[in-house]
């Protein structure tokens, strides 16, 4: 039985019911339906903190999913898991791969900026101001892209860009 069918969370159950109805109504191939089932189960496992199970489901969804737009969200969620696990290099890779398929994911740009900013802070603590500046410059570029896609969002990033005189 798919994981999402046994989940006790009301929102997850509601999402599952709506998704199942849509899958029946919208013409899709069996592969697309199976890919979505793995994606949905991955989201369910991820929301419960079961990252290993979520990754297994996402990798299986990636194997089956052919639509670049849908693949971008799978890759983005894999990036989220790696971010949560402190695997920032892997996370950046998956966010980048998601953006290659869908350049309109401001949340991926934001998460990449947060990682770069964090690495800049680490470089400062290690006394490497040159490396810190490089990381901060990269964070600024990613935040600018996120803000361009969704003006009015990422207020803290906008404030940081303004305070550090990186906002044009």
Swiss-Prot record:
Keywords: Chloroplast, Membrane, Photosynthesis, Plastid, Repeat, Thylakoid, TPR repeat. One of its GO terms (cellular component) is chloroplast thylakoid membrane. Gene3D superfamilies: Tetratricopeptide repeat domain. It is a peripheral membrane protein. TPR repeats lie at residues 35-68, 72-105, 120-153. InterPro entries: PSI_Ycf3_assembly (IPR022818), TPR-like_helical_dom_sf (IPR011990), TPR_rpt (IPR019734), Ycf3/AcsC/BcsC/TPR_MFPF (IPR051685). SUPFAM superfamilies: TPR-like. It is found in: Plastid, Chloroplast thylakoid membrane. GO terms for biological process: photosystem I assembly. Disulfide bonds: none annotated. It holds the Pfam family TPR_1. Interacts with Y3IP1. Essential for the assembly of the photosystem I (PSI) complex. May act as a chaperone-like factor to guide the assembly of the PSI subunits. Belongs to the Ycf3 family. This is Photosystem I assembly protein Ycf3. It comes from Arabidopsis thaliana.
